[in-house]
Amino acid sequence: MITILHYLRECSDMTADLIYTFQSLGLANGYDDVEAEFAPFKEFKSTWKRSGHSVRFQISDYLRGADRRVLEDFANSLYGCLTGEGPRGIYSDSLITWMGSKDFVNRNQPIYLKRSRNLTLDHHGQVYDLQDAYLSLREQGLVRACPDAVFNWTVRENRRRVGYCSVLMKVVAVSSILDSVDVPSYVSEYVLYHELLHIEDGMRPNRRHHDKNFRNRERLHPRWRESEEWLRRLASRPV
């Protein structure tokens, strides 16, 4: 009971900090009627509706736990977007640092997984184990240790989007279409490798994700050419 009350009090304090931060900075930016609330979006995003000197913000609840400085930097970035006078993008150095912290992942990864409907929440597949693929990549020296990352097969057999990840949440998804005796194990390993490269790169606001350097690293996988051919065949397979 005490733990629940403490959690509710903490949430209330965080919401109060959010409102105070956005309202005080709103006045400095010409908005005298400001509302701000946390919203349970699956991905990290925020929305706003503006009318004259009024503005309503819905802020990703993954920002719960951020300190006042991070909230202020984020609010300033959003107001900059509204006025068109701020820096490009919403990711300040303090925000990037905090979202790359272990505390951020520990707080938010379980929430993100709960909101992800197309994940089995298991690295064990019917045929292959993504944890084994990760260990194989480590033994080959292709990836660094990533102890916070979680690997999941998808529920649906995606043919074109065979892998994706949340760099923020350290979550990797590999399409279950690759979890088959008809598909060699190195194909899912290659897809996992691709996504782990993104996680290793971390947040890269306003930069290309698949640049020349990334493609060169991707091709360090010894079976990249065969894997790409497999992925092309699977993508063109009739539904």
Which sequence ranges carry the predicted segments?
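Active-site-proximal or metal-binding-adjacent scaffold patches in catalytic folds
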Residues: M1-E189, I199-V239
